[in-house]
Amino acid sequence: MDGYQYEHHCAKLLKQRGFRDVAVTKSSGDQGIDVIAYNENVKYGIQCKYYSYPVGNQAVQQAYAGAKFYDCNVAVVMTNSTFTEPAKELAQKLGVQLWEKSYIPN
């Protein structure tokens, strides 16, 4: 699976979990958001990272900025992997949700 395929995989998982109006953004110039989805009238901006190593700060920064650009209520980084401690700290400060191992919370 590559990054593009993972974005579509994430979109499929979101639909299965009851998110609606799930859309994958264009691959270039996406402003840091790969998928936009709604759950209970909350707009999520999701950065998808398919990595073989822990995701770092840059993805958190991209999700935060991209969510602002798309007027999302919630910024998320979703990965098949895990996150570095600095990324976790930054996400907590910025209010970015981190979904590890493709886990989508209720």
Regions inferred by a protein language model and the residue ranges of each:
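Mixed-charge (Asp/Glu-Lys/Arg
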Residues: 1-106
